[in-house]
Amino acid sequence: MPPETTTDDERPVSALQSPEEYLGDLCGRHQIVLLGDQVGVRQHLGFLAGTLTELADNGVENLAWEFTNSRSQAELDALINAPVWDSRACADLFVDLLGAGFGYEEYAEVLHAVWRHNEAERRRDADRRPIRVIALGLPTYVEDPDLLDGRSAGELGLRNWSLGGHYRDMSAFHAASVLTTEVLRRGERALVYMSVAATTTGLVEWVDGSPTTSAGNLLWRWMSDGCRRVVFHGTVADTAATERVEELISRSPEGRGGTDIRFGLDLAASTLGSVAMTEVHGSLDGADTSLRLREVADGYVYLGPRADWEPCALIDDLITDENFASAEARYRALDPRPEPYTRDELDEVRRSGQQELSGAWPPLPEPPEEPKRRFARFRERGADR
């Protein structure tokens, strides 16, 4: 008899929550949920754009992110609340981030998705509160080439410094302050989408022998259980842990079912939470200790294997005649030279940055080495005798 085949309808249904349901439910139970990511992962931005209905249904009024500078909040509000979508105004917001390299279609699509969601909600229920996007980005004064006297920010040691303090620390205090003013004091809820390094809560990471400060650290000290950290699979820079998580998933009932797996879960009571972290260095409650995944994050979103990540696509025609002068001045502050850059040169800089996105992500696990065929060669020599 031929072997029995399992149809799609007969495969076991996973008891895990979908990542959208999980994130919406978590945001409904905590005032601030920090979602940590690497820069430029296409699938993750698509997921974020698709969570808006779940967020709104769970009472979340705000999506905060660091990919628009706070100085552009008025323009961001006008874009999201406009009666007609303005793709040019959206692109201009990302010109303000050209030096940091966020002129990508998928980031713009998140803003467009918020606009579409709010427009649909207004048509259905005029009293329903829209989702607001809160800008957390903090530019530095080294963007002005006139302040650098022909030298680069790197040469002057200023690239990571702002207002007399280290930029990572200053941006952390800035983001926490904005969230306090715009969310906490209003008694509202927010999903905060930031780079994974900015979302640490109880964990204090050490870089070059010194402790770091993140927006998540500050919020967690103020709010404790009111603040939770969620990370995407593969975003924490620990290759061995990423490999171990994928191994555990492949051995799970869902993994053996042969279907695509997507889920979100709390790590505290999960087997995945016990995965050891060997490449993340930091302290909990002031003491250095060996870390497990549940001590690095509260929640986990799995959309697929780390090897499936794809980089975002560039926004077409980001640089125009109207914004070229300001964009050129900002880039010349980062990479100064006597003569101004041309528009073609700025476009080439953007293309190079897009090609380098994947190189900045945590590395993939090394594939296992194939065994050497020594015995085969020995048999071949024996046969010749």
Segments predicted by a language model, with ranges:
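Compositional signal for N-terminal targeting/processing segments
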Residues: M1-R385
